[in-house]
């Protein structure tokens, strides 16, 4: 494991303006209510709670071309970037609870200010790499990667609210896992830029063990560096995470999701985490909401050392009779 002190800071990001459905701003509260913090405190990490950010709507936030709520999304991300950078400066792992996935702009930007050599593992049914020119919906939760990529700088007009963003990762610094709903413009971008991805076809063909081996070899083979895991719960199949805004059939299993997060923990390099797109208002039943929230909690815990094989406290002799 890494030698830096093991501590993490939870940042609630109750924000929904990157997409049209209300309720995703209730994600952080649902994860807290499910006992996420208490459970994290049982791991070897020192857990701090930053609380929830209070995002203020920008009045008269008219669309830019077809891009919706640009100033509100830009401002929320600018605020989040500052908080994440502060957490990183203090040597803690930033854990951002979304909120919609447009927040990755701020989360990854803030992380990169302190660790410019970071790499990104993006688990999602979607690439979220539409640009303001290729998007058909105008929803910014489908565009965060385009703002972060150096290779796309200058490929689309300046969006109001985003003047603070400096692209901070290259095409070779990101790997996608779980893709199965990619727009033509996005497919063109990932192919043209040579971005590494494991769609569900590759996951089916190789198995998740090989996928993670290849992911680490590609991102960390030459040099160990901080990992930012941006996890959209729709990366998993809707059988496990139905309460989310854009579910797509045929996704990762619960087991594959846990394997991804367990393996990332084992590298000792996880430095930033996003748990995104839990929308407790979209479950058809209480059971669907519970399943989605509990799955998101389990994925988060696995990132910090909770193992399916079980855990025990180091240095404790469990066979000693109690005094």
Curated annotation (Swiss-Prot):
Expressed in macrophages. Expressed in precursor and mature group 2 innate lymphoid cells (ILC2s). Expressed in lung tumor-associated myeloid cells. Expressed in lung tumor-infiltrating dendritic cells. Mn(2+) 1 binds at residues 101, 124, 128, 232. Binds 2 manganese ions per subunit. It is found in: Cytoplasm; Cytoplasmic granule. One of its GO terms (cellular component) is extracellular space. The modification N6-succinyllysine is found at residues 17, 75. Its EC number is 3.5.3.1. Pathway: Nitrogen metabolism; urea cycle; L-ornithine and urea from L-arginine: step 1/1. Its cofactor is Mn(2+). Keywords: Adaptive immunity, Arginine metabolism, Cytoplasm, Hydrolase, Immunity, Innate immunity, Manganese, Metal-binding, Phosphoprotein, Urea cycle. Gene3D superfamilies: Ureohydrolase domain. The modification Phosphoserine is found at residues 7, 62, 72, 163, 217. SUPFAM superfamilies: Arginase/deacetylase (SSF52768). The keyword Disulfide bond does not apply. It catalyses: L-arginine + H2O = urea + L-ornithine. One of its GO terms (molecular function) is arginase activity. The modification Phosphothreonine is found at residue 281. Residues 1-27 are annotated as: Disordered. One of its GO terms (biological process) is negative regulation of type II interferon-mediated signaling pathway. Substrate binds at residues 126-130, 137-139, 183, 246, 277. Belongs to the arginase family. NCBIfam families: rocF_arginase. Key element of the urea cycle converting L-arginine to urea and L-ornithine, which is further metabolized into metabolites proline and polyamides that drive collagen synthesis and bioenergetic pathways critical for cell proliferation, respectively; the urea cycle takes place primarily in the liver and, to a lesser extent, in the kidneys. This is Arginase-1. It comes from Mus musculus.
